[in-house]
Amino acid sequence: NDKRTGGEIDYDPTKDKFTTNHYGLGITTNRYEEFAKIGYVFPQKKYKSFGWQLSSFQHQQDSYFGLTTYNAKQNNFYSNLIYQSIIGTTANKFRTGFSFVYDQYKEDFRDVNYNRNEIVPGAFFEYTYSYSDKFNVVAGMRVDHDNLYGFFATPRLHIRYEPIKGTTVRVSGGRGERTANIFAENLGILISSRQVNIIGGVPGKAYGLNPEIAWNEGINIDQKFKLFKRAGTISIDYFRTDFQNQVVVDVDKSARQVDFYNLSGKSYSNSFQFEIDHEIISKLDLRLAYRLFDVKTAYHGDLLERPLVAKHRAFANLAYEQKGWKLDYTITYNGTKRIPFTGNNPVQYQLPERSPSYISMNAQVSKTLGKKHPLDIYLGSENLTNYYQKNPVLASDQPFGPYFDASMVWGPLTGRMFYAGFRYRIK
């Protein structure tokens, strides 16, 4: 269970809720989960087994954002029956089975109901080929039937190859399909005065929109090395996702509305990451990383960068551990981000097209005392550069006016912070 309240400093929910005295918001969440696992392994054939997984949850969220209400309830049931065995030898393994998913959604947004029941039975088959520890392939296919969207297939392929000792190459690819939950996945946009428009009109489908469908593929290369007789690892990742359909969240057509609609045009993401880990001297580890995140989507015909997503990020970490002492220092570079269009607002409520880039730093030192019942004492600081976004809430002086928008967050919201504490473990 979780309950959160926010808003203006003077906001008092007992007096100001659903009034225009002071702006406030509240989110109350209750969630209950149940699960069970049953399995049987054949005594004479350890490679052969049955498994049955069962789970369910009930999730309820009651929330308000100023004068806007959003209440949602989800009941979920999941069943998965798995049979595992081999084909000839243990180098050829397979898993197959049946699954069943039931989801009941009851959503109420601004007094409009968006209810649906999704029933998705399916079957799957997965084959694994292993050749020693150097090469293996996992190929899978599942076919499901969604009562709202019909049949769909999701193939998947994973290959792992170790051509030489210390070098590992992984390749993967496949297809995915899902139903977007447009309100629950975009709560931040509700903390604004934007008019919400759902442009779909497909009867019998969730919000009148099509499911999201994407193909993705990627490669990962890990290389172990030694430098000055000390071990290290270099890791390179590249992944690409191409959407056949996507529920587009468009906040660019107007600063005073958000449109949800099916993709018409291109949408893709390219993710490249380079990381190096190395013990540069005794007990001192260095980690360096760089990530390129190229994400673009067609918004009303214009192919644009995804808003509020940094294309470039870099990271460096130093970690030292000796005789109970631990020191950790991290510096992060966050590149510039595209800010959604605000040009049809009055001048005082317009934002620049891009955010500035910025650097943040965190540090912590800790000392462990005792062995039988260790006590950790720590001292640290976050955001050492004291860089934070000034005036993150657009039109904060008129929270119930037409230009109010608290969703344009591109940087830290709090300045430099120091903390201290201790951890005591009882074995």
Residue ranges and their predicted role:
Residues 1-50, 56-74:
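Flexible loop and strand-edge segments within Gram-negative outer membrane beta-barrel domains
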Residues 2-3, 44-50, 89-94, 134-137, ...:
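Repeated loop/turn-to-beta-strand initiation elements of outer-membrane beta-barrel proteins
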Residues 2-4, 42, 56-60, 89, ...:
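Transmembrane beta-strands of outer-membrane beta-barrel pores
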Residues 40-42, 81-87, 129, 143, ...:
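Residue-level signature of outer-membrane beta-barrel architecture
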Residues 44-66, 93-102, 108, 114-160, ...:
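Surface-exposed extracellular loop regions of Gram-negative outer-membrane beta-barrel proteins
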Residues 49-63, 162, 170, 207-262, ...:
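Membrane-embedded beta-barrel scaffold of Gram-negative outer-membrane proteins
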Residues 132, 235-242, 262-342:
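Gram-negative outer-membrane beta-barrel transporters
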Residues 335-342, 367-427:
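C-terminal beta-signal and adjacent terminal beta-strands/loops
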